[in-house]
Amino acid sequence: LDKDSIVKRKVFHTLLSIEEAELKLEQLGLLKPIGEEEVELENAYGRVLAEDIFSPIDYPPFDRSEVDGYAVSIKSVEGADELHPKKLKVVGKVSIGEIPSISIAEDFTTSIDTGAIIPKGADGIIMEEYTERVTPNEVIVYKSIVPGENISFAGSDISLGELVLKKGTRITYKEIGVLAALGISRVRVFKKPKVVVVSIGNELQKPGTKLALGKIYDTNGYAITSFLKQRGFDVRYHGILPDSEEVVYNEITKLLTSFDVVITSGGTSAGEEDITYRVFERLGTILVHGLRVKPGKPTVIAISREGKILFGLPGFPFSALSVAMLLLVKVLERLEGFESRLMIARAMSTFKVRKDIGRTWFMPVILSSIGGKLFAILLQTSSGSVSALLKADGIAIIREDRDYVDEGEEIEIARFGDELKEAVIIGSHDTLLTMLLTRFGIIDRVSIGFVGSYRGLQLMRRGYIDVSPIHLLDPATGEYNIPFIEKDKELSNKAVLVRGYRRKLVLAFAKGNPKNVKGFEDILRTDIRFVNRNRGSGTRIYIDKVLEDIAKSSSQSFSKIVRNISGYWYEVSTHTGVAAAIAQGRADVGVCTEHAAMLYNLDYIPLTWEYYDFLINVHSMDKNIIKKFIEGLRNPLTKDVVNGFRGYEAPSEMGLKLCC
């Protein structure tokens, strides 16, 4: 590195845990509300109370009837029942909203509305259902009552001077309802901090523009802004800034005149070109430079000379969201006078993981509820994953003092929401599947993960998931899926195999076939780079089976054949991933579905048809959503949809049980 680069390069200072970072900001007096203001009740939703609220009245403010019926003296109906009814004289009616002038004496009554003031002399209310009005002036009562029955007494709900809401309470529709009932029209609340989000990076483009090679669309700016809006913060997205220290410095300087908190995304790693640290240092004082978490280590927090918070999030989406969820939200809530508790669930780990002691790991998980147990299923993604934001139900938190988590252990999960999805579908990838789930009207009610057929099979064998899509070729029989279930006694006792549909696999290559590919054997050519599917996928099994046949026919070992294939270890996890690699010139040839090849305008040679079936947990068969899924597969209209997609076929037995 040259001298300038060495000067610019920053190493991380002492790394802090999430808790230590929050405590440091608190000890410096930075996590205090920024001010108070009074607002009209109709504008108070989502705000945080800056003072205790004491009731200015009794509630209810008067003794009132809880039912429609008759106001009586207890003595008048003593001993009354179906066999010994009492006849009372009706002396009028008390309507809601009016002050009664009637006084109830023994053997007299008055009809009364729900919510009306209790007239003098009445001890209770007989419900209308236990009476019979025989004349306009007489009523027969078939039930006795106890003192105070069906009466709500003044102050019985809330008493005059009672503490109703505490300072620091976030106002929801419930609090607004109570305040309105007490006649309170204005409340004193903490001011909401004004927050702005800025994305930094030369590689970023605005969604809606044509994506250039090597560029990515800005995810964090939109995702973090929306996430904070969902949490009720006053936040604005400012846009994308280039990796220029001067541009970022000047822009943030301007933003600090209008906002209380500036959040940046990107430009936070300890590399020579990352500039967030240097900009924050010029604007004020660095307080936190690096967290003991993975992902999320390159987080920067500073205080500007104006006393405003600068918060630098990492550039990778899952990393940024994890830190935003577990630390940034806490900071912003403290600035508006609120202290929340993170929604933590406990779930059984379905995976084993070794980690280094000294850092807390954040891992995206899908949550599966089967047989009264909650399972956490790891999504195998990187911190740069965008799909993890969509697929995950929460973040598994593996604390820094742990170096190993075993399958079956209980672990902490920071939940993204209150509700669990009704079913979990994990297994082989297929584009048509999500379209069918949408057509069945259940796409929003299921969690989906594409991990390959073998991993789906393993999760099903352990009883962790509801449905596993598979397409596994048995090399011995040439049959798909059924042999794997029949040979596995444990699996066959836990799941049934339901027929799905057929897909055409093709050998795909660039339009015009510039490499003059004629067949599968051409992937052995030294001038051709192959893109493979991930280990554990059904397509990988097919590829390796074909390569084994080639090895046998040429009297070579499988390992030797593999060593000679350029790109054999270049693995992607989806059919569209294969097609994209070819379309973008990162590979010359690969095996994918015909549909994926067409999406990327590739040429191809047909290889084989495979069955894409559904393994279903026997304990899930009674779930309404699983019944709806199977019914959808059996629907003749669904077969028409499947047959309408190039490279797909719907067999006559689609949706029927195959075994076991």
List each language-model region with its residue ranges:
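Flexible glycine/proline-rich
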Residues: L15, E19-E22, E37-E42, G46, ...
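N-terminal segment of the mature folded domain
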Residues: G441-D522
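A ligand-binding cleft/hinge motif common to bilobed small-molecule-binding domains
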Residues: P469-K487, A579-T608
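Periplasmic-binding protein-like
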Residues: L491-K504, M598, L602-E631
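Extended ligand-binding regions for polar small-molecule ligands
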Residues: K504, A508-N516, E521, R525, ...
